[in-house]
Structure formats: structure tokens, C-alpha cells
């Protein structure tokens, strides 16, 4: 079935285990970026709906003095997470198709994402079970008259605000560890891609997740995201999205000294030396920038290529880029779909136009594919003749646009790689392992890829430096983002403390 023939399910907000219409009765259109057609609606939640969701989450934590969820053994919560994972796999094809319709992601990528969603729920089910073994862990003290242990308790009600580029996967990165820790959550997905997150609600209902443990409020950022960030009864906010929105979330949380985790933008480098297999390096370079239609926070969108191979490398990149199938995401073999919205489409075109006006050269792409009359499609774009003062070098485009600059020495490559306000990721491609190790240490980023770009595993931590945010998601520490550590120290001597003189001995 082609994208133009399909619609998305009609859903309401998910609050306290039930479907509820938004308080103000408004809905937002779902636009298929492939056809520009309206293919459904999502509820437009507002502050009233956020209040109801937060209240439901708080009630879920308190129910039965916490024994139903927050204080239940991690093994109990793990059963729910595994049940969710199983349902995601059961509905994998349906969910992947919905993401292709909703945000333009090629179907094969979306199907891969669903495997990752299930794997992430499974991984944090393991972490929930491991949490039982970590509870009451002893602390060695220098005084034998005391003993100490640590409790790890859920931080409370958490607000989770997620982006549109990996709609269900990015939500899962937050929902799975939060629930594993025993928190109750309110999820606010991007209004540009909320469809599969609402299907997650349906899955949670189907597996019998206790009411209020996960609530999902869709809507616009100012109407639903902002009230969630500033809500006095939300104990923590975790956000993935733009730098500008991240600043607003920090400002909203600051008056209550509320902890936040922020995974923001990037302008990541990929450094290619002259000792590489050029075809292999070209494919990783293009994958690092054009995967997910170029809409990845960690996209290695600044190519630094050694002068000795630059001409051949650029020629091969152009040939490979022209061979990428740009099409309806549901067509077999699609490798680049449309960007998510008209607004994003116009923004990317403006970046390309500005680069040309500043003197850059468009090697290939930069326009709508000739065979696609509708949809928010942009050909894979490669830009050269870049200076470090250009907007295209400094600002995150969030589209299929790669800018290229040459270097002559390793020191120059390191300097150019770090010439950014962001610090999410970086990649180095070289046959010299020691050189790769040096650059892994020198590049200022939270994630470094060697001889590849963009692999991501939920077993390894994810996060960035500088304007790419702070905190780390995933990995063994992922669950700790949603835990509060409590020290319990006990005096165990039979002797009195003896600091003050007892009145009975006067």
C-alpha cells in the first residue's frame, strides 16, 4: 500500500489508564510529509490535561503506599516492560508503517527502530531486576560503631518530552528506564510525530500497566510541553530536542531546582584520513549524514577529508549520493524519504540558499527530486568550498545536507573537528588504530565512532557536551537518571554515644 492511501488511528489522550478527550476539545492535523495530505488527527492537550496526567501519575506512586509500583520489586516492573516489548514486536509492521506515514522515515529504518524499541524495553527490564540486587548495598565505614547501606528509590513523577525524528524510539529511551526505576511518567511527544506514541498507550493498556504509571499528552509545545516542564508536582524533566527549547526547559525547572536531563542539538564532525578504503569510508560518511533523512541530532554533517584524497572522495560521494533511492518511504528499497514538515523543508532550503550566497558550492542535490512533485523531499546534498564562518558550518541543519572541508595535518583536523559549540558526537575513519585512539581522546564529544558513524546500542551511554546538553541516557547508568540515592546509617554499639555528660552521673 502506498502512503497516500492510508490513514492513522483516531486516538485520545491517555490519562490514568484511560482514553480521554482533551479538556478544550481541540485536535491537530496529522500531515503525511510524503503526500502533504491530512491523514488523521491527534488530540491537542493543554495545561488542564497536563494537570490531570500529573495527578494520575502521583496517585499511581502513592497507591497502596507505593507497593503497586514505586516500591514493588523491580522484577514486577520488569514483567510489564517485557510484555510491552513483546507487543511491539507483535505489531512491528503496523508500527513501522505508521512512523513512515507520520514522519517520512523509510519503512526499513522504521522497522529497525521497532526492533530497537523492543530491545530497549527488554534491556531496562533486566536493569529493573538488577535493581533488586543493588538495593540496600552496604557502604564500608571507618567506624565499627556504625553501619550504612544505600537505597535507590524512584525520583517520583517525571515529565518526558521527546522529538519527532525517532518518535517511538526516543520516547522509549526515556519511558523504559523511568518505569524500570519505579517512576510514574507523563510523556509529551512532538506534535509533528505523535502517532506511534499513542499506539504505545494502547499497548500499555493491553498489557495491563497499572493506571497512571504512564500518561501520554499530545499537543503543541507551548500548550502542553511548557506546562509539563514548569509543573510544581513534576520531580524531574528529561528532554530531547533543540538547544533553544532546552534553554526554556532549564529556565522553567530552575525556580524549583528541578533536575533535568537534556539531549540537544549537534554539528558533529567525521574525519577521514588518506589511508582509508575510499568506498567504505564514503558509505559511512553518507550514512552518518543521510540516515533518517538527515534528521539526527548526532548526524556527522561536517566532513573533514584529507587533502590528498579529497578530489576522489568528493567524486565518489556524488556518485553514491545520486544512487540513493529517494521515494515514498513505503516503497521497497527507499533510503531517503521526505523531511518531517513543510516548516522543516523551508528551513533546510533556506540553509542551502544561504550557503550558496556566502560562496559555497553545491556539489550535488539541494533541490527537490525531479520525479517527486509533492512531499517535503530534498535530494541528498553535498556542499564544498566552506569557510568556518559560514552558517552551514556552524548551525544544525537537521536535514540531508553534508558540508565538506579539507585538512592537511592531524592537528588541523582536531582543531576543525572541535570548532563547534556542540559536542554530541564525532567520528574518525583511518587505518591507523593509534591515530583513531588519539582523535577519540581529542575530539570534545560524548560519543565517538571509529571507522563508522551512527551505530547506537542501548547498552552504551548516550549524551553530549557543551551545547549538546548534559546527562547520559541508556547504558547501566540510564536507570540511575530516574533514581534518588538514600543513605541509611545506623548506630549499632551497645554503648551510649557519650558526647554529653549524662545527668545521672553528675
Swiss-Prot record:
Keywords tagged on the record: Metal-binding, NAD, Oxidoreductase, Sodium
PROSITE patterns on file: ALDEHYDE_DEHYDR_CYS, ALDEHYDE_DEHYDR_GLU
CDD domains named in the record: ALDH_F10_BADH (cd07110)
Residues annotated as site: Transition state stabilizer: 165
Gene Ontology process terms (BP): cellular detoxification of aldehyde; glycine betaine biosynthetic process from choline
Its biological purpose: Dehydrogenase that catalyzes the oxidation of several aminoaldehydes. Metabolizes and detoxifies aldehyde products of polyamine degradation to non-toxic amino acids. Catalyzes the oxidation of 4-aminobutanal and 3-aminopropanal to 4-aminobutanoate and beta-alanine, respectively. Catalyzes the oxidation of 4-(trimethylamino)butanal and 4-guanidinobutanal to 4-trimethylammoniobutanoate and 4-guanidinobutanoate, respectively. Catalyzes the oxidation of betaine aldehyde to glycine betaine.
Similarity comment: Belongs to the aldehyde dehydrogenase family.
Official protein name in the record: Aminoaldehyde dehydrogenase 1b
Gene, per the UniProt record: AMADH1B
